[in-house]
From Swiss-Prot:
This enzyme's EC code(s): 3.4.14.5
Keyword annotations of the record: Aminopeptidase, Glycoprotein, Hydrolase, Membrane, Protease, Serine protease, Signal-anchor, Transmembrane, Transmembrane helix, Vacuole
GO MF annotation, one: dipeptidyl-peptidase activity
Residues of the active site: S751, D828, H861
Positions of glycan attachment: N560, N805
Species classification: Eukaryota, Fungi, Dikarya, Ascomycota, Pezizomycotina
Species assigned in the record: Pyrenophora teres f. teres (strain 0-1)
Sequence ranges on the Vacuolar membrane side: 115-907
Record's protein name: Probable dipeptidyl-aminopeptidase B
Job description of the protein: Type IV dipeptidyl-peptidase which removes N-terminal dipeptides sequentially from polypeptides having unsubstituted N-termini provided that the penultimate residue is proline.
Amino acid sequence: MPRQRAPKEEEAELLTKQERSTRSSEDASDASVSSISTTSLVLEHINNPAINGTSRSRRGEKYTDEDDEAQEAFDVEDGRYKAPVAVDKKTRRWLWIVGIACVTGWALALVFFLMSGSYKHVSTRPHDPLASSTKGSGKKITMDDVFGGSFYAQQQSVKWIAGPNGEDGLLLEKNTGNAGYLVVEDIRNKGDGDSSAKKTKLMQKSSFDVDGKLVRPNEVWPSKDFKKVLVQSDFEKNWRHSGTGKYWIFDVATQTGEPLDPENQDGRVQLASLSPQSDAVVFTRDNNMYLRKLDSKEVIQITRDGGSELFYGIPDWVYEEEVFQGNSATWWSEDGKYIAFLRTDESTVPTYPVQYFVSRPSGNKPKAGEENYPEVRNIKYPKAGAPNPIVALQFYDVEKAEVFSVEIEDDFRDNNRLITEIVWAGKTKQVLVRETNRESDILKVVLMDVEKRTGKTVRTENVAELDGGWFEVSQKTTFVPADPDNGRKDDGYIDTIIHEGYDHIGYFTPLDNDKPVLLSQGEWEVVDAPSRVDLKNNMVYYVSTEKSSMERHAYSVFLNGTGTSEVVENSGSGYYEASFSAGGSYALITYQGPGIPWQKIISTPSNKDKFEKVLEENKHLDRFVREREMPILNYQTIDVDGFKLNVLERRPPHFNEKKKYPVLFYQYSGPNSQEVNKKFHVDFQAYVAANLGYIVVTVDGRGTGFLGRKLRCITRGNLGYYEAHDQIAAAKIWASKKYVDADRLAIWGWSFGGFNTLKTLEQDGGQTFKYGMAVAPVTDWRYYDSIYTERFMHMPQNNAAGYDNSTITDVASLAKNTRFLIMHGVADDNVHMQNTLTLLDRLDLAGVENYDVHVFPDSDHSIYFHNANRIVYDKLRWWLINAFNGEWAKIKTAEPKSQVDARLERR
């Protein structure tokens, strides 16, 4: 129903309806490119009110009634109906001069117009992600485009594999059509017409029969000699990285399969792993470990006391989520004679119940009479300060069939130890163990000799004393074997180290040396390094931020720290990922942006045989992007309290500095994270800018990654303070810009970003931001898991004040914001619903009501169950539009509409 419009709504309309009308006019005129001459096209554009500025609703002005303009044009007083009057010579001369000037000006405008190419449809132009303005016109980005995968770049999944005799440059490929289901191909033959004869076929078909049962593989792992394939089928998900399945041994020569455990072929296996010698498989079932030697049908049980609270060879929930980001805690020695594994005892870990009101993830039918009760899954979840699982490293001697442990004199106590990485030192029967204390600020590297069953700490670092920070979990330590003939006298390893406040890589040799050879240094950082070590050429490959913290480039360096060079020559500005072949002679280079992504395989600097093969160019995506009006990306840095922070500003197409735009801040802000980078990425933020016409700003504030430890570690012990402060400081900078409507600023985020959204609103108290949207937020760090939280906050017992400061408690400050939104998955096993519910209770107690809540039954942290993910973004969109249209401001002063007598209405 029509109602009185506020001035702010009219300004919002100028950014929505009016602009859509203007752009539709541009689209209509541009659509005629192929059917009319250039001259008529130019005239059409010049006469188009949307282009020449004579639109009745002028940008930057309030709405103008059309009847008023018509009256002004045809006013009786303008002389329209007066008799013609003769023009004298002087006047005619001036008219000629003015006419000639107009024609000349028109001609110059025509030349400029043609040279600028403004008449062209946007699809005729190459995509320029760093363009400062939009030329031409195109289709608007839609939500279906974003969430339907239209902007996804095709990428070929390349899995490098070493040949049985150490051959390099081999690829493992699945679903290759006529060539077979699982094949090994030399990269030099890839794409050379009918090269099937040059491929090694491991599995011809995509299924096989075992005792009348059809087996369809989910995952496959070839043995190192290419004679067997370990096959997983019938996978059922457990947590984020884990699940169970049925496992099979497939014989390549006969193309037949058999059960991993012939006596229990329907048993659900949690993890299975082939030995490096291709002669055995170790696996975990029902939390106990087993060994199957492939020359026998017999299965040997390694452990027997595993159960609901004791795991062997696999991680529990918190280790899976926060340490390994995977489902394996089992490691074969290179000679296949020993197996290292974790024994995880979570009997003292408290339980958290997760409720499912719609589904039954267990697959079990409820008991009679309990059909109407929710299914409850109890998770052993250690919250900050609560007892952690007790983790111990154990070994299994395959020949002796014996389980044993190696004691270390100066080891951490059981309740103060995190085991984060295990690396076998080749065939030396030694193993490197990376451990930290519970708060992750003291590191120990332990060297164990499993044959002698002795061990010692070879390296200790206390980063709390160094810079007050923490150690990140890493599984990139790489063993480098001795090779005296090739200049490597002793065994060693490469690890990430801290050098002058930045993450770099160092080479430790011999194994017990605690002083590394520096392989990289500078005011930039390595990323998940090293990527590969070429032992033949003593060369190390790594990816770093040397050119820009917003970019990634691949480099090589010799083991003595000299000869650094870029893998991709003249790569320019960009975000590159690199995956290196087993021997380091080839690399899959994936260009992620800012332009259209592409992939190619190249020879590396250590390979004298130059090679290059393009795998993917994403031409379809390039065409699709050209036809759309993309947001204008403006990368920059801002100074906040002496720190340089990276910023990405997404501007609407056809951005006009004379207009006033609302601004949405999107951030994650978590420790060591990064959102501002130069990847090609079209997401909800791009949609908001390109379709809704709002500016979207992302700021990586203090605490985020790849800008050095000084900026990163300042947040320790007080999460949320600097993160929120920096968002507010950035918002004030944008609020002062002439093209920003300072009364329409909002912020949103998910997970840690949801926490920081609420923390920002709490700290700001409505002075800068008026609106916020928080999805799955932490509201009290005492509720989050111990390993993650204590790394950045210490234990609550050691930092009670810090936890109090980080908790969202100042609800009176939240009440000063115009309105905020909270959404959460009820079955979130990561950030528990408890976080949102306890905040709602605080709001209720204080009588705060300026917020909306949406919960999603049975959804976990990703919020996907029953169409929930699309609803999240639809809700964000709808809620944001209402915020910037001023609807939420009206709710504060809402009054009932006066009732009209029905008898008067009938009259």
